[in-house]
Amino acid sequence: MTESEAGGLCTDILACVDLARRANQLAGSLTLLDRKRLELARALATCPRVLLLDEIAGGLTEHEASALVNTIQSVRAQNVAIVWIEHVVHALLACVQRLVVLNFGALIAQGEPHAVMASPEVQRVYMGIEV
């Protein structure tokens, strides 16, 4: 890859993760949301086919998590498959096509996200609600 091609790739990746406007800022000066976007950009620089996201929405406000979901959807639009481990359920429900719920490593539900969340076992284990 030439220097020019690498620069173009970086520009494209920063645009994909909504960081183009911050391209000249130091990482330490970025907000938590933008640091998470930067982590995505670093991973995308390797041109992966699959990304594993582990609790990426942790620590974000609901508004920030929503903005991160938009960023993740942009990444998915680049034909990158995403495996996402997360406890911020509203972020998952806004983004995923399929949800798998584990409890101590055991599968308790899988399928369409809203149907999975309505499952009595998921309600009991994760919400403490007896249905």
Regions found by a protein language model. Give the residues of each.
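Glycine-rich phosphate-binding loops of nucleotide-dependent enzymes
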Residues: M1-V131
